Regions:
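Secondary-structure capping and domain/repeat boundary segments
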Residues: 32-192, 197, 239-263
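Extracytoplasmic Gram-positive cell-surface binding/anchoring modules and repeats
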Residues: 58-71, 126-139, 288-326, 411-427, ...
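Flexible, low-complexity junctional segments that flank or bridge functional domains
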Residues: 339-631, 656-659, 666, 670-672, ...
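Bacterial N-terminal signal peptides that target proteins for export
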Residues: 2-9
Length: 939
């Protein structure tokens, strides 16, 4: 049936065609349509080493069908691209022949190292067909490394390409002790020299842990591995350092050669602005910053002296600083200023020259280093007048050479950095500030301004020790600088160097250079304590406190027994101090029970005053209640309190850096004066605050003046028969806590200043015995104190100017000048004598010297203990602090000053021999003392 239908359809088509042809027979024959061929483009695929992808043809403006991803060993296909890093978009019409390239990501494989008990080695990622770098040879105690093995145990070839993840296993062989030592030795040798100033000297082998004992064989090399550059005049040389390696019972000695060289020039590359805060009330100095310079990787700071002086304006008199001239020329800094002395009507031209070419600091007049210093806030010089050079008997002798500090001898370098002159900070501080007791302390993080050496536990001390360097080691450059600085300071600022026959302190330092050159802070501090207490061994030189590099809580060199001292200081305790204490205890029961004064006879014509130290307080004296003194101390223009009645007034400045306060002791006021002064205060607007709790006999007064709540305490002290007024610029938080000013403190104020103490003691003695004619000043238990306090005490003994003789050790200058004490009460024509012992030291020794030199009266007792020098504080670069005998020495002048009988100046370090000897058992025996005084021929 289907075939029939198909044939019928074909027949029908033929019929229709025929009819059409007949109907159109009269029209032109039609032209055929032109055949249009479609334009095509070829897309070629370059797999760049991958599996082949055949090219394809694509019609113009058509889109390419993305082929299947090619494959390539060790790679992952990423995409096709025409241009690097830009993936081809297969939705883009094709308009030309193109070649698409395959982008591949190389496979990564991990190579893992199994060290089999050796050090852990991090896995390494390697690209396909890459090679893995052989790691450093691992080490394992007791074993020697053989090779890295594949899984089959054979040695891996590190030139082999990596085509899969891989684990390599260390193959070890057991070593003999000798072999272990050899490997340790080779490892030490490879890293032995770190720098010109540092060697790597481990105490255990870095591979097998062999015990290593070093013998440096040179004072220039420490057990810490610090190498000291050779001092000037020493030829370069090679020294052999030996190390004994021990493994079990096996010992092997090896030698290491070390080149000792001269110091290399300091190259300063890094600067840092360091914050500065002044923490002493003695000088008013603003906070600031100071640029410090360092070598690359170094910790020793360098500073421009001009910047340093400008930083501490306030210690440096602003008027002096304004006229100082700083001249920089050809590697030389010259600092100049004129200094006018009104008493002499003379101007001194003061100059110092800092020469980086010759490495010297030259000062013709050493006064350069102190003449610019501002007066301290504390009134240490009250009632002291210095006679000028025209006073009869005045003398001064000095070499014309001045001072030359040759820093080259100590490898302390002056650096010329692009015309700026820089010196080690510790040296600048000591020269330009420390010699006047002001110090700028650098602790690695900040700068702190302090006076002398603050007490441990004080705010100043805590600020000094607050540093990020706590518990760390010294750097080698700091160790070297510290060693040389210590030698320089001791050679130039220790006043008794010549007295004790010390040519240079390098001799002492080199005896124990290994510990002085240690990088361990505790070791250095122990060595310094030994040097000061055992080698130098004199009372004015002692350890202060440890470096800020030490761990918190470390107190440094602590004296716990008499053998911690050398024979001189130990002998002073055993032969002087303790026997005198025994004699005092035998007489009065204890040293604390010793009276302020006592009489030698029943008639009380001969008395003894006890003076165990020379103390001073910051105070002002007046015969009237001077409110300007109150205003000055309280830093105000306001009149704070009404004037009080009395015959003499002592104004004590007892404030601190945060608070102002003044305490006034008034002689000549009646016991009933409290009610009178209370009425004056209340009339002035003060409110009286009193709680009848029985804890305090009186309350306090308060008033707000200028926004400040002032506190005033007033009371009469019956023991000393004085009236007390205390003024503070703040109130106590509660009534029951400690008050800032306290009427019960009268005894402490009076006894805290030797001149005030002596005045009140004489008041009591003369009141008790109007027949008093002879006074013996007992300084047998006096170990020194403030020189100004000593001078004021002498003012009670003589109203005439008295002579003091000084010797300056570093310059060789010698002088005798005269001092007069004013505003001293008149107690009539008393005859004075002095009682001394071996305990009478320092200022006590100076009192005996002044007595002797000025013929103030007979000296009784035992030869004094010496102590010719004043004390100077020293801060080392590493922060360790100590005090020592300075260049300023007390002495005696003999001779008449003529050509035939010239003046001879002798320091009194050996002490003063008394005119009349007393054994220690007779020091406090009334009959023995009285017999001497009665037998003495008085002028």
């Amino acid at each position: 049936m289907k075939k029939v239908i198909k044939r019928l359809l074909v027949l029908l088509a033929l019929v229709i065609t025929s009819v059409g042809l007949i109907a159109c027979n009269e029209k032109p024959t039609p032209q055929p349509e032109p055949i249009v061929e479609t334009e095509q483009f070829t897309v070629t695929f370059d797999t760049l080493g991958g599996s082949e992808i055949p090219s394809v043809k694509v019609d113009k403006d058509s889109k390419l069908t993305k082929p299947a991803n090619p494959t390539k060993a060790g790679h992952e296909f990423s995409f096709w691209f025409l241009e690097e890093e830009f993936e081809f978009d297969f939705q883009t019409p094709i308009t030309s022949n193109i070649t698409l390239k395959a982008s591949w990501t190389v496979n990564e494989y991990t190579v893992t190292f199994d060290s089999q008990g050796g050090p852990e080695i991090a896995p390494v990622v390697v690209l396909f067909n890459g090679v893995v770098t052989q790691p450093e040879t691992p080490h394992k105690p007791g074993s020697g490394f053989n090779f890295w093995a594949k899984e089959d145990g054979t040695e891996f070839d590190f030139a082999s390409p990596i085509t899969d993840n891989l684990t390599l296993t260390a193959n070890w062989i057991e070593l003999t002790p000798e072999q272990q030592i050899e490997e340790d030795y080779q490892a030490v040798l490879a890293s032995f020299v770190v720098s010109d100033m540092e060697l790597n000297v481990p105490t255990y082998g870095p591979i097998h842990g062999s015990r290593i004992v070093w013998n440096m064989n040179s004072p220039y090399i420490s057990n810490s591995g610090v190498v000291l550059p050779l001092l000037e005049g020493t030829d370069p040389t090679v020294v052999s350092v030996s190390a004994t390696f021990r493994s079990g019972t096996t010992r092997v000695k090896r030698e290491f050669n070390v080149q000792l060289k001269a110091a290399q020039p300091v190259v300063l590359t890094n600067s840092r602005a360091v914050e500065f805060t002044n923490l002493t009330t003695e000088y008013d100095i603003l906070p600031g910053t100071l640029d410090l310079w360092f070598e690359e990787g170094g910790t020793v700071p360098y500073v421009n002296p001009e910047n340093f002086l400008r930083l501490i304006e306030g210690f440096v008199d602003p008027e002096m600083l304004s006229i100082m001239q700083f001249t920089y020329e050809a590697g030389i800094l010259t600092i100049y200023y004129p200094y006018f002395v009104e008493e002499e009507n003379h101007t001194y031209e003061l100059t110092t020259v800092i020469d980086s070419v010759n490495q010297t600091i030259t000062t013709r007049d050493p006064g350069f280093y102190w003449a610019y210093a501002y007066s301290t806030e504390t009134n240490y010089g009250r009632n002291i007048e210095y006679m000028d050079e025209t006073y009869p008997g005045y003398s001064y002798e000095s070499p014309e050479t001045g001072l030359v500090y040759d820093l080259g001898k100590y490898n302390l370098q002056i650096v010329d950095k692009a015309g700026e002159i820089l010196l080690p900070f510790s040296l600048v501080n000591q020269l330009f500030a420390g010699s006047s007791y002001y110090n700028v302390f650098y602790n690695g993080d900040k700068l702190v301004g302090i006076y002398a050496l603050p007490d441990e536990g004080s705010d100043e001390y805590n600020a000094m020790m607050d540093t990020s360097l706590r518990g760390t080691q010294f750097s080698p450059d700091l160790v070297v600088n510290n060693f040389n600085t210590l030698a320089f300071f001791m050679d130039h600022f220790y006043g008794l160097k010549e007295y004790y026959g010390i040519a240079t302190f390098y001799d002492l330092l080199f005896e124990k250079s290994s510990i002085f050159l240690s990088t361990e802070p505790k070791i250095f501090d122990g060595a310094l304590g030994q040097l000061l207490h055992k080698s130098i061994d004199e009372l004015h030189t002692s350890y202060g406190y440890p470096s800020y590099y030490n761990e918190v809580g470390y107190a440094g060199q602590v004296i716990t027994k008499i053998n911690d001292f050398g024979p001189k200081v130990g002998g002073w305790y055993q032969n002087s101090l303790w026997p005198v204490e025994d004699a005092i205890s035998s007489k009065w029961g204890s040293t604390a029970a010793r009276p302020n004064y006592w009489f030698l006879n029943t008639e009380k014509t001969h008395g003894v005053i006890t003076l165990d130290s020379f103390r001073t307080r910051d105070l002002y004296e007046s015969i009237t209640f001077d409110n300007t003194i109150v205003q000055y101390i309280m830093n105000t223009q306001e009149t704070l309190v009404p004037a009080a009645t009395g015959t003499k007034f002592f104004f004590y400045n007892t404030g601190d850096q945060e608070n102002d306060q003044v305490e006034v002791i008034i002689k000549g006021a009646a016991e009933t004066y409290f009610n009178d002064y209370k009425a004056l205060l209340e009339a002035a607007g003060y409110t009286y605050v009193f709680q009848a709790s029985g804890a305090r006999p009186v309350g306090y007064f308060t008033k707000n003046i200028g926004g400040i709540d002032y506190m005033v305490v007033a009371n009469y002290d019956a023991e000393f028969e004085v009236f007390y007024i205390g003024i503070a610029d703040h109130l106590p938080e509660t009534y029951s806590i400690e008050w800032p000013v306290n009427a019960t403190n009268v005894s402490g104020l009076i006894n805290g200043d030797s001149a005030v103490y002596l005045e009140f003691t004489l008041d009591k003695m003369t009141a008790e015995s109007p027949a008093l004619t002879h006074v013996t000043l007992d300084i047998t238990y006096n170990t020194g104190g403030n020189i100004g306090a000593l001078y004021r005490v002498v003012g009670f003994i003589t109203s005439e100017p008295f002579r003091t003789t000084s010797i300056t050790a570093d310059t060789g200058s010698k002088s005798s000048s005269y001092i007069k004490i004013v505003n001293v009460p008149n107690y009539g024509p008393l005859k004075w004598s002095l009682l001394v012992s071996g305990v009478s030291f320092s200022a006590g020794n100076s009192m005996a010297t002044i007595f002797n030199e000025n013929n103030l009266g007979p000296i009784l007792g035992i030869r004094t203990g010496g102590g010719t020098s004043s004390i100077t504080p020293i801060l080392l670069p590493n922060g360790t602090a100590f005090t020592m005998s300075s260049n300023s020495m007390n002495g005696i002048r003999s001779g008449s000053g003529t050509e035939l009988d010239p003046y001879v100046y002798t320091n009194n370090e050996a002490g003063i021999t008394p005119d009349y000897q007393l054994g220690v058992d007779a020091l406090y025996d009334e009959a023995s003392i009285l017999a001497i005084l009665n037998g003495h021929i008085w002028p």
